[in-house]
Amino acid sequence: MLDIKFLRANFEEVKEKLQHRGEDLADFECFEELDTKRRELLVQTEELKSKRNEVSQQISMLKREKKDAEALILEMREVGEKIKGLDNELREVEEDLERLMLSIPNIPHESTPVGETEDDNVVVRTWGEVKEFNFEPKPHWDLATDLGIVDFERAGKVTGSRFVFYKGAGARLERALISFMLDLHTEEHGYEEVLPPYMVNRASMTGTGQLPKFEEDAFLIESEDYFLIPTAEVPVTNMHRDEILSAEQLPIRYAAFSSCFRSEAGSAGRDTRGLIRQHQFNKVELVKFVKPEESYEELEKLTNDAERVLQLLELPYRVMSMCTGDLGFTAAKKYDIEVWLPSYDTYREISSCSNFEAFQARRANIRFRREPNAKPEPVHTLNGSGLAIGRTVAAILENYQQEDGTIIIPEVLRPYMGGKTVIK
């Protein structure tokens, strides 16, 4: 959520920056009208309440003097009815303003490239050499199915499309990657491990920005009004909702493994085969709470931490700076890390690393004090995938495949695979 005082003072500047996002600003235009109306109602209400207090004192004085106060009592009742009407009107205006504020996306940082589509994203750096195969590389879903380490067909029978059973070496590879990533981030990168709940309430989904705008993308348990988490970012960020932290506690860095659940509404026809776009998938998420002046330095560190996973796995990748039109609702700046997938003959996203500045912190009321008696101010929050497990499995299968269909296990994973060197 944006700072309403900043928005009020810089309306045209914010409007211009949101236009760079390609946003429909029809609702945004209502802000000034609603904000003005709210402030007018507050003034009117306070004036009437002040008048009511004065009349109440006059009535008390007349009663003490045994004088007739009936006219003033009637006047006070009329004032009370007016206050009641204004309070109801104010409540409606504030609810409309709250809905509007929750629907306005974050302002892009000045370093975010201006553009309309993914074609305008900027390559920041590349790492690793793309392997040249002397045979036609297979897609990961064929490799995994032929090896018997996944079963899409039976998962479809048990649940539906875009689910998978991992089996044997496939299940162990998934588990190995989870352990490897958590060990790396906690032992070398300084994160604290968290195992979060997989269900959250509406306040949590609103705090991180999934609600109200993206409810159709989430799985709702209607009987409880809980949501299955689309990412561990939601429960982990909301761990500190409605809290005031001390400056000494910052930065806070969490690494959380979880399953993630997404309806992928509107993605029919895209990545319908394989592990790239599943309704349920595993991910290690990195979440940070930092001082505002440190957040962009922490974004670079966060991105480097996610990159380190791919470097140790020796998987070629590139880092993209996302343009304003491809930034996402909550981010002020975002990097996508894209891993090379031979069967696609291109790079595909495996991690997004974002700085939300104070956007989520305002929604979730997460603040800190610089000094013990200082006024609380919003923290800056960041998060990134470190990494998406299924997509990492896909990248390993495709980049480490041999002509006979076997898979060389990356050296760094072999201790987690019981010393095995090949999946066959």
From Swiss-Prot:
L-serine binds at residues 231-233, 285, 385. InterPro entries: aa-tRNA-synt_IIb, aa-tRNA-synth_II, aa-tRNA-synth_II/BPL/LPL, Ser-tRNA-ligase_type_1, Ser-tRNA-synth_1_N, SerRS_1_N_sf, SerRS_core, tRNA-bd_arm. Its EC number is 6.1.1.11. GO terms for biological process: selenocysteine biosynthetic process; seryl-tRNA aminoacylation. It is found in: Cytoplasm. PROSITE patterns: AA_TRNA_LIGASE_II. This is Serine--tRNA ligase.
